[in-house]
Amino acid sequence: MSITNPVFSSRLKTLATLGAALFVSAGVAAQTVVDQTAAAQTAEAQAWRTQLTPYVWMTGLQGHIQPVSGAPTVQVDKSFSEVLENLDAAFFVSGTARKDRWVLHGDFSHASTSSAEPLPMGLSARAKVRQSSLTLTGGRNWQLTPQSSVDLLGGVRVWDIHAQVQVPGVASAQSNTSFVDPVVAVRWRYDFDKQWSSLLYADAGGFGVGSDVTWQALASINYQWRENIYLSLGYRHLSVDYRSGGKRLDFSQTGPLLGVTFKY
């Protein structure tokens, strides 16, 4: 014999209805969270992410300078401490912008130095070099592993070089030279953990278009100091060999660097 209690049955139906409603609501809420997370990730991937790095480059200077045909060729070989003694001005900054897998990178270097160099027959020449270079590249990023990625880049390096050689009481010659070199580059990053990472960068160019050859190499260790601030310690080499119409500008800069990166 079964006993049906109308009140009990009504309560069961009410509980079942509420349970179903809660289940559906939870499912909708979960799907909403997933949709919002996916939308946020998509928006982040589509937005430009930028960083700016002013840095100090403790570079030496080595090379040969002949500002015009027939002028004396001066050999320069200065350590950073010697360059610092004769440094007139210097400014270095680099920046990167990323959107999804696309990458834009730029670096600007400017330095002006002057020094006295010996010549044959007991003469002395005063050499002054003001060099500015702007490297602009773009390309694509590939994620190799969860900890490492590589950028393959192509672009140009724009040079503006003022060179002057003066032999007191004998002669003086100067030239202003500007040219553009095509460059190809590779940039590899490896994350050791959430705070420490390493960076390797190399490029090569010129190919006879502007200079005969230009190349650059850089290695750095980076530390995340604040949420959007990174500190870097590295070593950099940059060289160019330009020869045209009796003019020779063949020099390289090498030395350690310290940088601060601000991410936006």
What spans do the regions from the language model cover?
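Cleavable N-terminal export/targeting peptides
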Residues: 1-47
